[in-house]
């Protein structure tokens, strides 16, 4: 698939189904470019049998994986999140050399609220359940900074175009929602791992383990722009 000046695979670079998440698979029919040059990433019921894991995967999800090996710069999408229960859309990147490291610009968890609303007393303004995160290695073990939600206004992300971006330099990683800085990472041990590699950019729709496999949501994650500004 060619989109926004880049070539994209319509599945993860290692395959079409994750052996630890076999209820859904990366379905090429669930990712397409519409007449307005927008990327559409679906979730829909589309069973397919995979002999390697001896299981029929019930739900087809849209995922695109960019073939470019990216280094420092700003990575940005403008998107409307999918609407439905137990969805797991994401804009993220991971190393071409190993996993981790991984940078999650956001992972969205709709849970039982189809528009990703989640009120928490301890964080009354981070009420859209979209989380930044960063995975790394320490003492041979996979670790993460921890998922965090952030305030980016009262606009429903399933009804409004929101800009999600990350700026990656050798000295810091900054996350922005609608051009507002929401998180900054400066830990040297983490940056050293990132700075030694190149990153694979991925945009995907998805579902969580709690999804209804009998009647899964028919959802659409629409992305109208992807921009990379190298440094």
Each language-model region and where it sits:
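GH16 jelly-roll
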Residues: 1-231
């Amino acid at each position: 698939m060619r989109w926004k000046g880049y070539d994209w695979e319509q599945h993860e670079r290692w395959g079409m189904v994750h052996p630890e998440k076999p209820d859904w698979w990366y379905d090429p029919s669930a990712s397409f470019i519409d007449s307005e040059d927008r990327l559409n990433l679906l979730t829909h019921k589309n069973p397919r049998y995979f002999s390697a894991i001896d299981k029929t995967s019930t739900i087809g999800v849209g995922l695109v994986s960019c073939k470019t090996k990216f280094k420092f710069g700003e990575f940005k999408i403008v998107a409307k999140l999918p609407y439905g229960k137990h969805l797991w859309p994401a804009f993220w990147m991971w190393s071409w050399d190993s996993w981790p490291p991984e940078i999650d610009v956001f992972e969205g968890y709709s849970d039982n609220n189809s528009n990703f609303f989640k009120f928490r007393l301890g964080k009354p303004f981070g009420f859209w359940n979209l989380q930044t995160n960063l995975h790394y290695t320490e003492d041979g073990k996979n670790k993460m900074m921890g998922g965090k939600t952030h305030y980016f206004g009262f606009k429903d992300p399933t009804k409004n175009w929101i800009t999600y971006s990350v700026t990656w330099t050798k000295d810091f990683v900054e996350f922005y929602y609608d051009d507002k800085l929401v998180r900054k990472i400066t830990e040297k041990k983490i940056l050293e791992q990132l700075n030694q590699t190149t990153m694979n950019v991925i945009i995907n729709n998805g579902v969580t383990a709690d999804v209804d496999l009998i009647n899964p949501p028919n959802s659409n994650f629409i992305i109208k722009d992807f921009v990379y500004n190298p440094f």
